[in-house]
Amino acid sequence: MTVAFTTFNRTDLLYQAVEPFLADDRISEVVISDDHSNENIFAEIRAKYLLTAKVKIYRNEETLDCYRNKRQAVKHATSEWVALLDSDNTFSKEFIDAIFSQQKWNHSWAYAPEFARPHFDFRGLSGTAISRNNIRSILPNGNCGTMLNAMNYFFNRDEFLRVWDKSIDPVTSDSLYHNYNWLKAGNTIYVTPGLQYNHLVHEGSHYKQNVRRTPDGLHEELLDKLIKL
């Protein structure tokens, strides 16, 4: 499997995020998709992993923003299965253990975390398979909408790319938009028991830096569309 990271003008946080996967033989490659960071920052990242064959680094020719860069990261993956992660979060061996604890990976399922520690706790939904057939009854759960906009999950590469839609840039509602399209296509989001990571809330996050650019009313519109699937 591939672990794919999106990043922009980050070094130390990125290195912390990547570290747990370097020695794990279950991970065939770590992809870093750099969204046209400053030249000196990209040069530092490239030098950091120059002798690490498992790490493959790509730089966009221009800044695509988070939603489109996620597609780039997945496109660069050479494995059938991909964990798409944010570069300002931290992970552990147990994150991968939880993925491999699933007896069989389903190409139409996305495996979502049950807990983005410490603030975003979705364990009330743990073990739930969410589809367009039951989203109406599940979404009113206060944490479900947050979970659908959290990403940091595991899926089939080709199915992700098939569903991905280029018609708008949802900015900070990017995960919610993709997950709406994922469910609309007849796929499932599984809140995976034991799948947890540390989700850093900070002023330099993509959300904090860009929430004002998100199209007015888009988040609420997507939640309404999910109810009506």
Whereabouts are the PLM-identified features?
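Short beta-strand/loop segment that forms part of the nucleotide-sugar
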Residues: S28-H36, Y58-R59
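A conserved acidic beta->alpha catalytic loop
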Residues: D34-A43, E62
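Short aromatic/hydrophobic "clamp" motif used to bind/position activated sugar donors
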Residues: V82
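Conserved donor NDP-sugar-binding/catalytic core segment of glycosyltransferases
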Residues: I96-S126
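Acidic donor-binding loop at a coil-to-helix junction in glycosyltransferase catalytic cores
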Residues: P170-H178
